[in-house]
Amino acid sequence: MRAPTRVYLRGVGRRYLSEWPFNEAHEKILREYRPARHYRLGLFIPCAYGKPYSQSYIHYLFRRTLAPYIREGLVHEIILTNAGVVPRELDEYWPYTAYDWNPHMETEEIRACYRRVLKKRITDYLTAFSGYYDEFAAYMRHDSDSWAALREAARELGLEIINLAPPSVDPRELEEAGLGLPEYMQDPDLLLVTKTALERLDEGLRRLLG
């Protein structure tokens, strides 16, 4: 049988959550992927509009705080997205570079489906690979569906996963982080690159890894 064409997926809904190619990509990770080493910390982080995620504005800024810990092999980034649970070293590969999920188009039904599908995938990942990590933490908005899915998966597995991001910051910090650009100001994850959030991230990493 001829292999399916590598398409670009743009939209929201079940088609962009649990069907081809994301379902197959998830199964392939469970079947063939292995973390490169044993890590002190597995850090769950959000996806980004820019692809690959590592070159997006949000990831570029908070990775500057993570950089020393990544270089020392202490922290492994694990990205949570409608496309699945994506280890950082796979974020430059299809299909994770070829989709656009617009959160402004989500309905409550779609959000519930997102949480349900992502929770299952997180549970799969933690069950398969938790032996590669001493512990886990998150750095994502407290009001995000990804954090809700992660908390539920952790609860069912009996794991404690703390969120190193602050619940909120001064709105003036958001304006500063957004550089006055509308495309940045519209991103709710802008909170993660504010001064307060980045300081909180660094303090949390020092506490966990010091």
Which sequence ranges carry the predicted segments?
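Conserved beta-strand scaffold positions in the cores of enzyme catalytic domains, especially
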Residues: 43, 77-80, 161-163
